[in-house]
């Protein structure tokens, strides 16, 4: 049974079957490992030190340093569990090794044009790496799923809340 301190859905990606692959680029995997290392080896020891110091002051019920420190430790431990589980399940896919560069696959940078001649460039990455503001979309997103397997010149139908729209694939690039 999960305690209130645990994420109930730490293992899976919400809304997907439990055995869905957890693809990541090498850069995303490295960033996740770096975050885990920083939390476990740098931040957590500092917080433990503050909590130990605060616990030595006596009454813990009104000790803000102690209470905040314990809360922060729970947050760190939750994130560490999450990162470890993700890293254990990660399937690192290096887009630079893609041999079929004429089609859209994981890791591709795709430029497409909307019906109003507006060009958009996106890179298809892992779910944890997605950042729409940076043009990095999850391979699980509706746009990426519509683009996967397409070639330059293909017309793709994107379903949007305001209705469907057709876009044409202009360029496909891999690192």
Segments predicted by a language model, with ranges:
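Low-complexity, charged, repeat-rich alpha-helical/coil interaction segments
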Residues: 21-34, 72, 79, 85, ...
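Conserved NTP-handling cores and scaffolds of large molecular machines
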Residues: 40-43, 90-91, 151
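Structured, basic alpha/beta domains of bacterial-type, RNA-associated proteins
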Residues: 77-98
């Amino acid at each position: 049974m999960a305690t209130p301190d645990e994420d109930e859905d730490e293992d899976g990606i919400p809304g997907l079957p439990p055995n869905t692959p957890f693809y990541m680029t090498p850069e995303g995997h490295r960033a996740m490992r770096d975050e885990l290392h920083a939390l476990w080896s740098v931040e957590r020891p500092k917080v433990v030190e503050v909590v130990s110091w605060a616990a030595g002051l006596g009454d813990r019920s009104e000790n803000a340093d102690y209470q905040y420190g314990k809360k922060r430790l729970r947050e760190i431990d939750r994130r560490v569990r999450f990162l470890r589980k993700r890293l254990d399940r990660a399937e690192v896919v290096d887009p630079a090794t893609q041999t079929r560069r004429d089609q859209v696959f994981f890791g591709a940078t795709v430029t497409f044009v909307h019906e109003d001649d507006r060009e958009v460039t996106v890179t298809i990455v892992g779910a944890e790496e997605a950042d729409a503001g940076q043009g990095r979309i999850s391979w699980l997103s509706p746009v990426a799923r519509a683009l996967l397997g397409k070639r330059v010149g293909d017309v793709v139908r994107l379903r949007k809340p305001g209705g469907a729209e057709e876009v044409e694939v202009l360029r496909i690039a891999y690192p």
